[in-house]
């Protein structure tokens, strides 16, 4: 009898030890890295939601798609006089360069989608959003600078490719249109977007933005 009790006790201890190992072997929930993220469609959804928070407001200084860059709207605070007096200071930390931070997040999702172990259709919408926002961001850069360096993967800070020369305007436009075509193919139509997700980019919205890009380039070419 004692032998049976001893065997049962040992088995229970081994079971508890196994459960404890499983319980303690958890991913940190307070700080996630790329290596432990992007394993479920929910991860991709949560990450893609961040694209919308990176959009610039109308008072941010990035107004490339708005009438604030035209002669329809002007400032009353005298900033234009700085140009005449030669007092305008060039700022190399302008918000324009922050667009590359947004492009990096787009590239991270696209890179992780390539190694996603599940059904690609589960994350198709979020991948399409990444393509759309990368096109949107490069169009902002195009409007400000013309040709810019094209970055398609999330480089580390010490990567020598970060100092690559700028690509031509035509190459940037080709990338924008290619990304928009991929976005259009995978985004849902507006009628199929749930009420809780209204405001997310739809297929119709991506088509409208592509039309804007084509019209903008038609005036330049």
Residue ranges and their predicted role:
Residues 22-23, 59-63, 141-150:
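Proline-centered turn/helix-capping motifs that create local helix->coil transitions or kinks
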Residues 131, 207-213:
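TPR/Sel1-like alpha-solenoid repeat signature
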Residues 29-33, 84-88, 153-160:
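Short linear capping/connector segments at secondary-structure termini
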Residues 1-28:
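Bacterial Sec-dependent N-terminal signal peptides
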Residues 147, 151, 197-206:
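Aromatic-lined, polymer-binding surfaces characteristic
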Residues 19-62:
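Membrane-proximal, proline-rich intrinsically disordered regions
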Residues 40-49, 53-57, 77-145, 161-174, ...:
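Conserved, well-structured interaction surfaces
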Residues 142-143, 149, 191, 216-221:
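Short coil/turn linking the two alpha-helices of tandem helical-hairpin repeats
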């Amino acid at each position: 009898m004692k032998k049976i009790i001893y065997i049962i006790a040992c088995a229970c201890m081994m079971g508890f030890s196994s459960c404890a190992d499983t319980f303690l072997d958890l991913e940190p929930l307070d700080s996630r890295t790329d290596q432990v993220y992007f394993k479920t469609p929910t991860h991709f959804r949560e990450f893609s939601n961040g694209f919308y928070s990176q959009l610039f407001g109308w008072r941010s200084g990035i107004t490339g798609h708005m009438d604030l860059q035209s002669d329809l709207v002007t400032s009353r605070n005298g900033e234009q006089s700085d140009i005449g007096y030669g007092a305008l200071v060039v700022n190399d930390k302008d918000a324009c360069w922050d667009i590359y931070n947004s492009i990096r997040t787009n590239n991270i999702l696209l890179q992780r989608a390539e190694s996603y172990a599940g059904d690609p259709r589960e994350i198709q919408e979020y991948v399409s959003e990444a393509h759309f926002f990368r096109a949107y961001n490069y169009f902002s850069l195009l409007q400000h600078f013309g040709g810019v360096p094209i970055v398609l993967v999330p480089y580390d800070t010490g990567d020598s490719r970060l100092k690559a020369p700028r690509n031509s305007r035509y190459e940037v436009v080709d990338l924008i249109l290619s990304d928009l075509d991929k976005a259009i193919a995978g985004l849902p139509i507006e009628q199929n977007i749930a009420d809780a997700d209204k405001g997310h980019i739809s297929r119709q919205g991506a088509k409208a933005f592509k039309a804007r890009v084509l019209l903008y380039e038609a005036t330049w070419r």
